[in-house]
Amino acid sequence: MPELENKFQVIVSKRAAQQLVEHAVFMARLEERLARQLAADFRKAADSLQSFPYRNPILRSSVFVTEKYRKMVFGKWYLLIYQIKGERVFVEYVIDGRQDYQ
């Protein structure tokens, strides 16, 4: 009997897409391969949210005061910030974890 698995719809906000582009442009100045790898890592992370998006911890922060957001690390130090509403996962932010976003 095949295993039944919930599939969540993942929606990337314009803001998150723009933040990803900004990070990739910066990395491309250093080495184009790094920018391509960042984009691939983001796709893999976002795609993985289709299954088990609750596996990542709730984001506790003075900036994000409500506990509606979750965080997922991808690449070496980037954070994918998202929230779950019903069967949809909304990717809201892409943050460089080395920077103080607090």
Q: Could you describe each region identified by the protein language model?
A:
Residues E32, D47, S51-Y54, W77, ...:
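Generic structural signal for secondary-structure transition and capping sites
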Residues A24, P53, I95:
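Short, flexible helix/strand-to-coil boundary loops that buttress conserved ligand/catalytic motifs
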Residues A24, R43-Q50:
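Structural signal for well-ordered, non-membrane alpha-helices
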Residues Y54-G86:
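Basic/aromatic recognition patch in beta-strand/loop cores that engages polyanionic ligands
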